[in-house]
Swiss-Prot record:
The active site is at 143, 164, 182 (proton acceptor), 251. Residues 272-277 are annotated as: Important for the catalytic mechanism of dephosphorylation. Homohexamer. Mg(2+) binds at residues 165, 207. It comes from Xanthomonas axonopodis pv. citri (strain 306). This is HPr kinase/phosphorylase. The gene is hprK. The Walker A ATP-binding motif also binds Pi and PPi. Its cofactor is Mg(2+). Residues 206-215 are annotated as: Important for the catalytic mechanism of both phosphorylation and dephosphorylation. Keywords: ATP-binding, Kinase, Magnesium, Metal-binding, Multifunctional enzyme, Nucleotide-binding, Serine/threonine-protein kinase, Transferase.
Length: 316
């Protein structure tokens, strides 16, 4: 999914938190940053003023403004020209410092957004860098029910009618929490982290066939819903046409594998849906098994090792 953010959107999202004022270049509100993970040489999203390797948001603190003041007239004009020519998303001055008139005029003439904040430079840098990195991170929407089970994020998937929503309802009644139904959105906020959230339209809602749309917060209380969770496991429900006949190895290890989501391989456990199976208990067990495996505890491997040792002892 291609993502972007404009200067106006960034300003509106951070105005209150960073006490921002827009003092010049109002016509540049449509300038935007496009997410482009394939461009290894793209500029940094936010940073202190850098003329050689410019940032998309250039922050001017006390030292940066003092450096500008130390330049002679020609050098100062050339430096401001360089700052403007690369078309940054915005310029941000920290600590409510007064804006130099020549910089303000250049920003107005070039339609470069110029903001002033009461925050210190490092606060601007931290907040803007984090917000931009998260906003522009790769993201994808997957079909399924995303829940918190035993404190880890579990995505329940399966074809239509496989019982995902009914399973989610049973898990809710057992004390687990809903993050998103039907269309959870996952953002890769770090090389090994997928953060799952719920679209605003579907917040707190769960659709169950025969019952319609349920408000989970109203039915089960505030603790039954979760704003976001990291995706750690996928449980896939499948309806086999015939009784499955797993091999001996599958009977030991279960039907496990992985699913590629963005740049990560997420562990996946497949559960056959058949009459009489308690899917809620099986899903809880699958989650506990995954937690054990992350700690290096694998019951199947332990059994195979015991079996091998027993055969070795009995071999003459």
């Amino acid at each position: 999914m291609n993502t972007s953010i404009t200067a106006r959107e960034l300003f509106d999202q951070q105005r209150d938190k960073l006490a921002l004022r827009w003092v010049a270049g109002p016509k540049g509100e449509h300038r935007e940053i496009q997410a482009n993970s394939n461009n290894a040489r793209r500029p940094s999203l936010a940073g202190y003023l850098n003329v050689i390797y410019p940032n998309k948001v250039q922050i001017l603190g006390t030292e940066e403004l003092a450096w500008l003041d130390s330049l002679d007239a020609r050098q100062r004009w050339e430096t401001i020209e360089k700052i403007i020519q690369v078309q940054p998303l915005a310029l941000a001055i920290s600590k409510n410092q007064s804006c130099p008139e020549d910089l303000r005029a250049a920003a107005d003439e070039s339609n470069t957004p110029l903001w002033i904040s009461s925050k210190r430079g490092h606060e601007l840098l931290n907040h803007l860098s984090y917000h931009l990195a998260r906003t522009l991170a790769p993201r994808v929407t997957l079909h399924g029910v995303f829940m918190e089970i035993y404190s880890i994020g579990v995505l329940i998937t399966g074809e239509a009618g496989s019982g995902k929503s009914e399973l989610a309802l049973e898990l809710l009644s057992r004390g687990h929490r809903l993050v998103a139904d039907d269309a959870p959105e996952f953002t890769q906020i770090a090389p090994d982290v997928l953060d799952g959230t719920c679209p605003e339209l579907l917040q707190d809602l769960l659709e169950v066939r025969g019952l319609g749309v349920l408000n989970v917060r109203d039915m089960f209380g505030d603790t039954a819903v979760k704003k976001n969770k990291y995706l750690r496991l996928i449980v896939h429900l499948t309806r086999p046409m015939t009784e499955p006949t797993p091999s001996g190895y599958e009977r030991l290890t279960g039907d496990s594998g992985s699913r590629h989501v963005l740049d990560l391989d997420v562990p996946l456990i497949t559960l056959p849906v058949m009459p009489g199976r308690n899917l809620a208990v099986l899903t809880e067990a699958a989650t506990r098994l995954h937690i054990l495996r992350t700690k290096g505890i694998d019951p199947a491997a332990m059994f195979i090792a015991r079996h091998s040792n027993l055969l070795e002892r009995r071999t003459p």
